[in-house]
């Protein structure tokens, strides 16, 4: 029931040391990232690498045992973004200033909402403040991520 060290290493490297939900960089964060079970163990999810993702403490905490979120535009219940089966850039973009994640599909929007990826409901936007510093440091956002066009 515990993920072994070799698997942890694989998950970290595969994720390029980024949270697979909010693309925070582990090195720039105070807390070590968690190995997230995409289908939670409480719902029968396995320790197979196909069911694992690297997640920062905030995303891991907000995701908890949830596998769905609400699309704020339609109020529909939508499965959360699945880092193994879906591609981040198909569902999310960065705002022009690189500080906020914008969901561009129902999956993206439901995930942004559930994980509060821009700290709009919690922490007084502290993740946005951290991103501003990372941006100044040249670590953020990841180069391959799309940004909103003006
Ligand atoms: Zn995260």
Predicted segments, located by residue:
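Short edge-strand/loop segments of extracellular domains
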Residues: 38, 43, 72-74
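Short beta-strand-alpha-helix junction that forms the catalytic/metal-binding core
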Residues: 19, 43-63
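Active-site-adjacent scaffolding segments
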Residues: 17-18, 28
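Extended charged
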Residues: 1-6, 10, 25-28, 50, ...
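Right-handed parallel beta-helix
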Residues: 21-23
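Histidine-centered catalytic micro-motifs used for acid/base chemistry in nuclease
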Residues: 34-40, 56
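Flanking scaffold residues of small Cys/His-coordinated metal-binding clusters
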Residues: 14, 30, 47-51
């Amino acid at each position: 029931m515990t993920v072994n060290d070799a698997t942890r290493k694989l998950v970290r490297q595969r994720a390029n040391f980024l949270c697979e939900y909010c693309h925070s960089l582990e090195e720039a964060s105070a807390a070590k990232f968690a190995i997230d079970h995409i289908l939670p163990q409480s719902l029968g999810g396995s320790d197979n690498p196909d069911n694992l993702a690297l997640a920062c403490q905030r995303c891991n905490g907000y995701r908890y045992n949830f596998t769905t979120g609400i699309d704020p535009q339609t109020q529909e219940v939508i499965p959360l973004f699945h880092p193994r089966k879906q591609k981040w850039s198909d569902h999310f973009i960065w705002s022009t200033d690189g500080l906020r994640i914008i969901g561009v599909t129902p999956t993206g929007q439901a995930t942004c909402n559930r994980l509060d990826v821009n700290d709009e409901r919690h922490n007084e936007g502290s993740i946005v403040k951290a991103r501003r510093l990372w941006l100044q440091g040249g670590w953020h956002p990841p180069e391959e991520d799309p940004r909103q066009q003006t």
